């Protein structure tokens, strides 16, 4: 019995080492930072999520009572509806993930961001606006729950391997589908802000050479068209 347990431990350790080496071949963790810095970064990201979630719902609920300048800007750019769609939140989560110190830190930071954003948005909706859109809330709660796993994977997209390249193209494909609407005979951006989001996403995910970046962009469009054919992808078009 003891021998069996010992062998199992060896097997588990072997698998763990193989997995670590596999992930490190994609992207290595950055230089370590202190625990205090980790805590400060995470708290800052939490408050960023709370601020953006509150601001998003404020624009949505008070759009006819906004201050003059903000109302003018919102009238031109339709910021309220833009913040109610998925593109900007995917971009922010992507940036938080990629620029985190490690894949684990990416998971923690992105999860904390969405907890702050989603909680503040729906608390404002329920207690100030006076209504709670349960169906949309459940979608966002579910997305928040899986965000650590998605962030963990996204962190590796800035690696140097072929798998990192594929991950970057796949992420950009999802971003393409939430920024643009298209079919056999038409192609439109949802708004100028979504165009900016996609451009920033392309810059963030860019490769070492212009040729590689162009190839990534091309592959991402092909993947976007393929993904658009799947019914489950429609969930990412939801609004809050």
Residue ranges and their predicted role:
Residues 87-97, 143-155, 195-201:
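Hydrophobic cores of alpha-helical transmembrane segments in multi-pass inner/ER membrane proteins
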Residues 180-191, 198-214:
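Membrane-helix boundary connector in multi-pass membrane proteins
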Residues 2-118, 122:
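N-terminal topogenic module of multi-pass integral membrane proteins
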Residues 149-164, 202-216, 224-229:
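Membrane-water interface at the C-terminal end of transmembrane alpha helices
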């Amino acid at each position: 019995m003891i021998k069996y347990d010992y062998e199992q431990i060896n097997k588990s350790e072997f698998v763990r080492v193989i997995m670590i080496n596999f992930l490190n071949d994609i992207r290595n963790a950055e230089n370590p930072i202190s625990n205090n810095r980790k805590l400060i970064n995470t708290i800052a990201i939490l408050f960023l999520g709370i601020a953006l979630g509150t601001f998003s719902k404020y624009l949505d609920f008070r759009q006819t009572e906004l201050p003059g300048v903000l109302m003018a800007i919102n009238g031109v750019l339709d910021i309220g509806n833009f913040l109610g769609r998925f593109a900007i939140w995917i971009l922010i989560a992507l940036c938080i993930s990629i620029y985190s110190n490690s894949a684990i830190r990416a998971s923690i930071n992105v999860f904390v961001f969405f907890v702050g954003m989603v909680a503040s948005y729906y608390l404002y909706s329920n207690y100030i606006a006076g209504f709670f859109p349960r169906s949309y809330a459940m979608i966002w709660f579910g997305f928040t729950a899986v965000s650590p796993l998605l962030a963990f994977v996204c962190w590796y997209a800035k690696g140097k391997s072929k798998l990192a390249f594929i991950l970057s193209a796949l992420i950009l494909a999802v971003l393409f589908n939430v920024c643009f609407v298209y079919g056999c005979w038409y192609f439109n951006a949802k708004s100028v802000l979504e165009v900016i989001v996609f451009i920033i996403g392309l810059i963030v995910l860019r490769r070492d050479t212009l040729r590689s970046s162009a190839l990534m962009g091309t592959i991402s469009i092909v993947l976007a068209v393929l993904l658009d054919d799947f019914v489950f992808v429609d969930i990412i078009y939801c609004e809050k």
